Curated annotation (Swiss-Prot):
PTM annotation (Phosphoserine): residues: 249
HAMAP family: Asp_tRNA_synth_type2
Disulfide bonding pattern of the chain: none
Location in the cell: Cytoplasm
NCBIfam families xref list: aspS_nondisc, PRK05159.1
Protein name (Swiss-Prot/TrEMBL): Aspartate--tRNA ligase, cytoplasmic
Family: Belongs to the class-II aminoacyl-tRNA synthetase family. Type 2 subfamily.
A Pfam family that the UniProt record links to this protein: tRNA-synt_2
Residues binding L-aspartate, per UniProt: 229, 273, 427, 431
GO molecular function annotations of the record: aspartate-tRNA ligase activity; ATP binding; RNA binding
Chief place of localization: cytoplasm
Catalysed reaction equations from the record: tRNA(Asp) + L-aspartate + ATP = L-aspartyl-tRNA(Asp) + AMP + diphosphate
Length: 501
């Protein structure tokens, strides 16, 4: 006589057969075969951000990731995510969906990529958890394009949770090392997507503004034969039967282009610094936005051009990237970035006076420390209501050998830094374009002339007066958004302790 369990199993098998026979939607869901460019169907995929009430009652196809899923009775709610936008989708038993299809949808692993056909429906009550709050997608077909593994190294909801919320209610947040160790997942968050879309906008606006001003974009070598600028903080690489170095800066080549009569040049490219600095704002590799420009009579012509370029970038970001700014602010609240037109320019001696009035003891020829930079930023904000300003006329003693001395005050120089929220984002100067004076200044700094011979020689055939500077892209992004670590704005950051991924 068969056991009760055996009898039960015998009863279940016919039930499975019956369920399969009753699965009238079996052609409407499943796992697609791997896309190997076998065909090109006549199907238009709609972007999630375009799912608005204007598309109500339309049948659309969408490809997105499964952000979350929640089964409830005979229906399943999915949140479908595409970059920084998401929409709610509903799979419910009915004419187009069987209970097997609902179960299939509920069991799709998070982060899997799916194709969905559905009807856009206007909702009566806004869906606060989604960017597309006024509509949802009523699913008719659902196919898995790429299945994610069931165990994720981090949960995206945890990764976008503000730290304050995590501290208050004990919910999980994700620390920086975990994020960077699993950067591919971390970059999928709405915050990361917004950061790097905005960063792309900075590059675009930088290029657009300078081309409109008559600048020429150049490309400079990153593998060089000698330590650029005579500096020591360089990476050495094997170069066939000798050694070469990774460029600390494109400055030499920018200046050579000025000597070659290009007059106004800029470049966007990697910069390498072998500095063992484990701070919130230093990287060993970052993207430099570099400018060099010949001027007629005064280096302030260049200062004004660079400052205006940055102002145009700030304005462009505020006009074109409000969605991204608001997305980042949800996780990292910050006051809007403020700037003046024309840009505030203070002399170094004025900054010293403000700091001394605030109780800081500093010598006239002492450089600003990071804490004093931040304090000065707060003082400037209080007095002038701006987060962006130029500090001019630095002491000659704290600037590189190629910096032009101030002809009226031998202790000062024709050099400047630009600041955002109390942190330096650009360092620049009028360059010495006379080979004799350049040689004297190099000797004064104890630099081996043989190592910078090519640099000095580039000015021996007539060089126009010129000035320039270098901007750190990641630092500008960080400070514009009010973030607290440059690793958040470097897609795959490199610092003294990180060489992967």
């Amino acid at each position: 006589m068969p056991s009760a369990n055996a009898s039960r199993k015998g009863q279940e098998k016919p039930r499975e057969i019956v369920d399969a026979a009753e699965d009238y939607a079996k052609e409407r869901y499943g796992v697609s075969s791997m896309i190997q460019s076998q065909e090109k169907p006549d199907r238009v995929l709609v972007r999630v951000k375009d799912l608005t009430v204007q598309k109500a009652d339309e049948v659309v196809w969408v490809r997105a990731r499964v952000h979350t899923s929640r089964a409830k009775g005979k229906q399943c709610f999915l949140v479908l995510r595409q970059q920084q936008f998401n929409v709610q989708a509903l799979v419910a038993v009915g004419d187009h969906a069987s209970k097997q299809m609902v179960k299939f949808a509920a069991n799709i692993n998070k982060e899997s990529i799916i194709d969905v056909e559905g009807i856009v429906r206007k909702v009566n009550q806004k869906i606060g958890s989604c960017t597309q709050q006024d509509v949802e997608l009523h699913v008719q077909k659902i196919y898995v394009i790429s299945l994610a593994e069931p165990r994720l190294p981090l949960q995206l909801d945890d990764a976008i949770r503000p730290e304050v919320e995590g501290e208050e209610d004990g919910r999980a947040t994700v620390n920086q090392d975990t994020r960077l160790d699993n950067r591919i997942i971390d970059l999928r968050t709405s915050t990361s997507q917004a950061i790097f879309h905005l960063q792309s906008g900075i590059c675009h606006l930088f290029r657009e503004t300078l081309i409109n001003k008559g600048f020429v974009e150049i490309q400079t070598p990153k593998i060089i034969s000698a330590a650029s600028e005579g500096g020591a903080n360089v990476f050495t690489v094997s170069y066939f039967k000798s050694n070469a170095y990774l460029a600390q800066s494109p400055q030499l080549y920018k200046q050579m282009c000025i000597c070659a009569d290009f007059e106004k040049v800029f470049c966007i490219g990697p910069v390498f610094r072998a500095e063992d600095s484990n701070t919130h704002r230093h990287l060993t590799e970052f993207v430099g936005l570099d400018i060099e420009m010949a001027f007629n009579y005064h280096y302030h012509e260049v200062v004004e051009e660079i400052a205006d370029t940055l102002v145009q970038i700030f304005k462009g970001l505020q006009e074109r990237f409000q969605t991204e700014i608001q997305t980042v602010n949800k996780q990292f609240p910050c006051e809007p970035f403020k700037f003046l037109e024309p840009t505030l320019r203070l002399e170094y001696c004025e900054a010293l006076a403000m700091l001394r009035e605030a109780g800081v003891e500093m010598d006239d020829e002492e450089d600003l420390s990071t804490p004093n930079e931040k304090l000065l930023g707060r003082l400037v904000k209080e007095k002038y209501d701006t987060d962006f300003y130029v500090l001019d006329k630095y002491p000659l003693a704290v600037r590189p050998f190629y910096t032009m001395p101030d002809p009226r005050n031998p202790k000062q120089s024709n050099s400047y830094d630009m600041f955002m929220r109390g942190e330096e984002i650009l360092s620049g100067a009028q360059r010495i374009h006379d080979p004799q004076l350049l040689t004297e200044r190099a000797l004064h700094h104890g630099i081996d002339l043989e190592k910078i011979k090519a640099y000095i020689d580039s000015f021996r055939f007539g060089a126009p007066p010129h000035a320039g500077g270098g901007i750190g892209l990641e630092r500008v992004t960080m400070l514009f958004l009010g973030l607290h670590n440059v690793r958040q704005t470097s897609m795959f950051p490199r610092d003294p302790k990180r060489l992967t991924p």
